Design a protein with these regions (language model features):
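Carbohydrate-interacting regions of secretory-pathway proteins
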Residues: 1-169
């Protein structure tokens, strides 16, 4: 791949609960939400931008909420984060030890990612275990957009998705 590829759902979402089963062999993938199309021109490998519930074979990015090419990592695995009205990020607590949380993920097997987004509050779970939690009060945050699943550029990989469930809140 020359740039990241996406399968994009036809409708946009704002407040929602999304459950997706995924299986990943190698590489990096994720679920974009509140995604926006990038402007024409160099995209640095990504035709979409948006908030992402990330996962990868190495485990480095699994259970992380980020905005690729925007505000970068918003909440690492294990963190409770508040982003204030001025866009300042502060870790305010923990949902668990990052290494212990990663043990909930079944490498190379089917896992279920759950994203619950209501207003600026986002909870990311994998296999029912909370990976991180974000309270984003920044008025510039993305509040609506498309849902998309990603195939990231990089080494050979295989990612599969099934049993996609969306509930608008």
């Amino acid at each position: 791949l020359k740039e990241n590829n996406f399968l994009v759902w036809k409708d946009q979402v704002e407040d929602f609960e999304l459950r997706v089963k995924f299986r990943l062999e190698g590489g990096n993938s994720g679920i974009y939400y509140h995604a926006q199309k990038r402007r024409p021109g160099p995209t640095q490998g990504d035709p979409l931008t948006g908030t992402q519930a990330d996962f990868d074979a190495s485990g480095r990015w699994t259970g992380v909420i980020m905005e690729y090419l925007l505000r970068d990592v918003l909440a690492e695995r294990g963190q409770k984060v508040v982003i204030d009205e001025q866009g300042k990020k502060q870790v305010v607590g923990s949902v668990g030890d990052p290494a212990e949380l990663l043990k909930a993920v079944k490498a190379g097997d089917w896992n279920e990612s759950t994203v619950i987004a209501r207003g600026g509050h986002v909870v990311l779970k994998i296999n029912g275990v909370i990976m991180c939690e974000l309270e984003d009060r920044d008025p510039k945050r993305l509040v609506h957009g498309w849902l998309a699943v990603q195939v990231h550029i990089g080494p050979p990989m295989r990612v599969q998705f099934k049993d996609i469930y969306l509930r608008r809140l």
